[in-house]
Amino acid sequence: MKAVYPGSFDPITLGHVDIIKRALSIFDELVVLVTENPRKKCMFTLEERKKLIEEVLSDLSGVKVDVHHGLLVDYLKKHGIKVLVRGLRAVTDYEYELQMALANKKLYSDLETVFLIASEKFSFISSSLVKEVALYGGDVTEWVPPEVARALNEKLKEGKR
């Protein structure tokens, strides 16, 4: 069975990688779908995020990285995918994700959303936190893959925030 794990992944963190690996133990195929979130200002472009994720996940089989502009359910319907994977770090994530799952179900009745609880050691990590700490010169190497740490340093040297 194929599932999609969508997100802005700006940048991908070890928490995301943990969810991806755990989802791959459940599903035969997983599409990591890089999406635009109009409420977020991204440091990396869609294509940069896609390339970075492909580098990070290059040793995993059964995973594909794709990008999508627009409604998530349109992508799912177009590709015949009926399972959505979401990671939950806290109760506040659950409230938002439940609303999104219900809205997506209304738009695509065949869709099922599977929630994976974040591993405790990654439960506090978010892409926003990573960017903020990196911006102020903090060490984020325990929170992101090495490829991401390098890319963050390069972006910050360029003056992109």
From Swiss-Prot:
A Gene Ontology BP annotation from the UniProt entry: coenzyme A biosynthetic process
Keyword Nucleotide-binding in record: yes
Positions contributing to ATP binding: 8-9, 16, 87-89, 97, 122-128
Predominant subcellular localization, coarse grouping: cytoplasm
Protein name: Phosphopantetheine adenylyltransferase
Coiled coil regions in record: none
Similarity annotation: Belongs to the bacterial CoaD family.
Reactions listed under catalytic activity: (R)-4'-phosphopantetheine + ATP + H(+) = 3'-dephospho-CoA + diphosphate
Record-linked HAMAP family: PPAT_bact
Keyword set, alphabetical order: ATP-binding, Coenzyme A biosynthesis, Cytoplasm, Magnesium, Nucleotide-binding, Nucleotidyltransferase, Transferase
Lineage, opening ranks: Bacteria, Thermotogati, Thermotogota, Thermotogae, Thermotogales
Residues engaged in binding substrate: 8, 40, 72, 86
Pathway membership: Cofactor biosynthesis; coenzyme A biosynthesis; CoA from (R)-pantothenate: step 4/5
Keyword flag Transferase: yes
InterPro entries: Cyt_trans-like, PPAT, Rossmann-like_a/b/a_fold
Cofactor(s) needed for function: Mg(2+)
